[in-house]
């Protein structure tokens, strides 16, 4: 769970000003505003972006409570919000008539009605009238008896529905929620059901509404269109809450009458109150108007409370995983849970289990198909996910379709392969906040391997590093996407810390110039764990830079006691490797940098040495020339003093090469310093020799 940010009054004022000026969502359109706001408030970009998302959700909640449309969405028709919310903490005596003590479900949805024309007849005994698309609006009428639950569907067009689908689940609840991120003309199936506690069967009707989540309460048997059912008070289950004036519409989903069977159903939240048997004399409280005033994903009506609870639920997902097994028997699908024993058919208490199918493609129809759910796989198409939860914790159940059991999309008739990982349902089901992703916990050796490949040029997510990414993924036995995620996180870490990302290198990894990997294998666990103190950011990719700075500041505090213990033990000549902190990878990187610098300095020194040698050689040559000239001048002076003409002629005929090249005809009257010094020195030497 990420750290909570505490803003000052000035920061709150700046954030609110930017929000009022258009910084209302987290899309690319508001990127520049979020960036400017982050610079002005001196906050991290991700912190401001998170604040925008929280602010947007709170405003949506307030608007939903007041009956207004959610801000920030562009719809052709005004939004109408359906709010069906249960307080988990509410005692059983205060629960509404459609809830039970141990079966609390948060049901929300935002529906955009299409244009409706002629209004048709209503049912006098119904609480809700479900009508066909573009024909009849939904209308909530007064009823004589609140305990009667009737659903009526006038048939104007062939509508996809399901029949003869019985559910043998005495203690199960259904939530089928759907969200679409792109508003289009697609419809989803909206099933409202009423549970019959006498024979564990439920009759329901079917309605399709556009755009947003489809919700189905209770294990249900979908009956053909046009049939009315009435239930006695002793079989009273959930009451359907709809706002007056809502006009969700029905659309022809291009299919024939087929069987839609929901074989296994679960609920999300659990309360600690004991179960109570709903009978004919069970106290039932009619739904109050308060239930219609709460908004999306709200249990208490307090946005601050709900955000705290949402984070608390998100933090629970990694603590106690629960496992579910599914198997198929006959025409129904039963569920067995390791933590729950299925009751006998005589018990009618709903368990707290849930299957949440969201993001299904438009007009997803199950046509005459049975689904075999096998353990340890997860189900989601490109835009659909199935969740299972027990004791509101994340479950590792794994539904998987057999080869012939596939989702049939009625519009394009495409089959989707089912695969993928689960996300957290209480985050993704009802919130626009980004889902918490599965985190990969690398071992110390895996991190050393990844950073070894990073140092070898695996620093890009593009195709240039594809071979290295595949090689390290094979070596670590992980998916390539996990390696790419690690690379992206490390690149972001480098950018935040102001470090230039090394350029990528193509081709396979070459470790010939790097230390042998065997040296890493010889390290003790104490040595190996050393470098990971400062590597928290590699694993915590969603934590802001403040946390990474904190972790780097904590690192010296952990090193000091180790060094102190090491110095104490050095006095006793008993130093253990566990108390020595060795930065293996960082030292290797620093060594590589220092080696390159040393090579540059060495090459520069070699050049200077060659230059010095050349100068020394030149100096030696000049010395030899000087001695020759000195000898010649000495001999010539002696010949001139002795007035020996023959000796003078012999010396002049055999001049040194340097003197032969000189032009004596244009000789300067004033001798240069060198010749003067040489001649004076020669005369001095001659006088001394004499």
From Swiss-Prot:
DNA-binding positions: 3-63, 435-498
Listed name of the protein: Highly divergent homeobox
GO biological process, one term: regulation of transcription by RNA polymerase II
Cross-link type Glycyl lysine isopeptide (Lys-Gly) (interchain with G-Cter in SUMO2), residue numbers: 135, 140, 144, 163, 172, 194, 212, 221, 232, 613
Keyword check for Nucleus: yes
Organism: Homo sapiens
Any one of the GO CC terms: chromatin
SMART domains: HOX
Signal peptide limits: none
Annotated region described as Disordered, given as residue ranges: 55-76, 112-132, 501-539, 664-690
Keyword field contains Transmembrane helix: no
InterPro entries: HD (IPR001356), Homeodomain-like_sf (IPR009057), POU_domain_TF (IPR050255)
Bias (Low complexity) ranges: 64-76
Key words of the record: DNA-binding, Homeobox, Isopeptide bond, Nucleus, Repeat, Ubl conjugation
Annotated localization: Nucleus
PANTHER family for the chain: HIGHLY DIVERGENT HOMEOBOX, POU DOMAIN
Compositional bias ranges of the Polar residues kind: 113-123, 674-690
GO molecular function: DNA-binding transcription factor activity, RNA polymerase II-specific; RNA polymerase II cis-regulatory region sequence-specific DNA binding
